[in-house]
Amino acid sequence: MSGQTESLMILIAGPYRSGTGDVPSKLVANVQAMEEYALPLFRAGHVPIVGEWLALPLVELAGSTQIGDAAFNEIFHPIADRLLARCDAVLRIGGASQGADQMVASARQYGLQVFTQLQEIPGCAGIVEPID
């Protein structure tokens, strides 16, 4: 990253449950897809964040026994909204996702930048998308 590019805290938003049938291996794959974008963002000088990094440990500590139970719902989406209030931007990746779309809508309400490709992000010109 050049010294002229401002470092941004960027929330990487993509599908988590969508299209998985809540199958654990598919949920893990969706988190990994978001994580694939974290390293290029970091190397470009930004602070990448995936909401699941914060939400999932808290959901477990809250005693959730299955996705969508009361403990899960208490934490999973609300923490994303709290996190957004402290971010500079959102990178929306992947396919259909009501949750990720809600994060984008909230980001726009907060006046945050919303990106859909790495190349749109300052300092990321020429970086190949990890996942097409």
State what each model feature region is.
Residues 1-132:
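Catalytic phosphate/metal-binding cores of nucleic-acid and nucleotide-processing enzymes, i.e., regions
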